Amino acid sequence: MSDSEERSVRGLVEELVRAFPFPDPREADPRGLLAYGGDLAAERLLSAYAQGVFPWYDEDPILWFSPDPRMVLRPPSLRIGRSLAKRVRAAPYRITMDTAFRQVITACREATRPDQEGTWITSDMLEAYCGLHDLG
């Protein structure tokens, strides 16, 4: 991504954060619940993630969380260790990206988990995330 493209994206994110603000994450309850309601429009989701907030619910209303502590991966600064890189190269599988997004998220949604009923990947969430993926 060029510098001008990066500035453009940064400007768009700042605009979305102003248009769809969330409360200060320090106001979250002990579980990280920060807000409820709203919708899963792409603009709101992008604004939420830019503010360290994500939706996690299984029926209405939409619940928005910002737990502390929270792990954040920043791909440009992510360093893969030598032993992991060696294992990936030697593994009998193939790593691909952006080839079957809907199928992968649907499989995650349908996976059974011990001691857990249902899934947080509701039909609305599936469509919202597929919509974000389609936007790039």
Residue ranges, per PLM feature:
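N-acyltransferase acceptor-side catalytic subdomain
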Residues: 1-136
